[in-house]
Curated annotation (Swiss-Prot):
Lineage: Archaea, Methanobacteriati, Thermoplasmatota, Thermoplasmata, Thermoplasmatales
Annotated positions binding ATP: 13-20
GO molecular function annotation: ATP binding; dTMP kinase activity
Transmembrane segments: none
Family: Belongs to the thymidylate kinase family.
Native organism: Picrophilus torridus (strain ATCC 700027 / DSM 9790 / JCM 10055 / NBRC 100828 / KAW 2/3)
One GO CC term on file: cytoplasm
Entry protein name: Probable thymidylate kinase
Keyword Repeat: no
NCBIfam families (alphabetical): DTMP_kinase (TIGR00041)
Record-listed E.C. numbers: 2.7.4.9
SUPFAM superfamilies: P-loop containing nucleoside triphosphate hydrolases
Gene3D superfamilies linked: P-loop containing nucleotide triphosphate hydrolases (3.40.50.300)
Catalytic activity, reaction form: dTMP + ATP = dTDP + ADP
GO biological process assignments: dTDP biosynthetic process; dTTP biosynthetic process; dUDP biosynthetic process
Length: 202
């Protein structure tokens, strides 16, 4: 928590875990400023769609640039508290799992990505929505505006790799409190657990 008592909270989890809905509800509950990543200024023109090491490195730097530009917005609202729908650990989980073959192991991958991100503001608290990738993919396929992926198996494997990274990151290797919630439960349960956990830090 920063000196004046305000708080910066990041909500993390794989696609389909319910981050955006929860971020909005937590912002309403706390009165905190709601933001998200990628930001509205993010340029998708250079994003690489392939899930491989080279594309993941390119995408990581694009998202990191957006995040550094996001810092001013976050700083301007910290005094009243900030909620972010995705933040740095989304990049580490998504792009890290794709670029891992460039490094010795997961630890070295994460260490390098955190070093590149060392000047950004880190959150005071993380809410991690844990969900089985297969269930998350079913949810995504039910969304009317969700682009249907022709290779469901490939996307499922990607979500499994990302989930593995999230689980490892939030297993205790970072010195940030993490509220872990079973996002496979009914949404009201997820919301209540998030608020209950959050109240211990407010």
């Amino acid at each position: 928590m920063i000196d004046n008592g305000s708080m910066f909270i990041a909500i993390e989890g794989i696609d389909g875990s319910g981050k955006t809905t929860l971020a909005g509800d937590i912002a309403s509950y706390t009165g905190f400023y709601l933001t998200r990543e990628p930001t509205d200024r993010f340029c998708y023109d250079y994003i690489e769609a392939d899930y491989n090491d080279e594309s993941s490195i390119i995408n990581f730097f694009l998202f990191t640039l957006d995040r550094y530009m996001h810092q001013k917005e976050i700083k301007n609202h910290l005094i009243n508290g900030v909620i972010s729908d995705r933040y740095v650990f989304s990049s580490i989980a998504y792009q890290g799992s794709g670029m891992e073959k460039r490094f010795k192991n997961m630890d070295e991958t994460i260490s390098w990505m955190l070093d590149v991100s060392r000047f950004i503001i880190m959150p005071d608290l993380i809410i991690y929505l844990k969900i089985d990738p297969g269930i998350a993919l079913k949810r995504l396929n039910l969304r009317k505006n969700e682009k249907k992926n022709t290779d469901a198996f490939e996307r499922l494997e990607m979500l499994k790799n990302v989930s593995k990274y999230y689980d490892y990151i939030f297993s205790g290797i970072i010195k940030i409190p993490v509220i872990k919630i079973n996002a496979e439960m009914e949404y009201n349960y997820v919301k209540d657990e998030a608020i209950k956990g959050l109240n211990d830090y407010l």
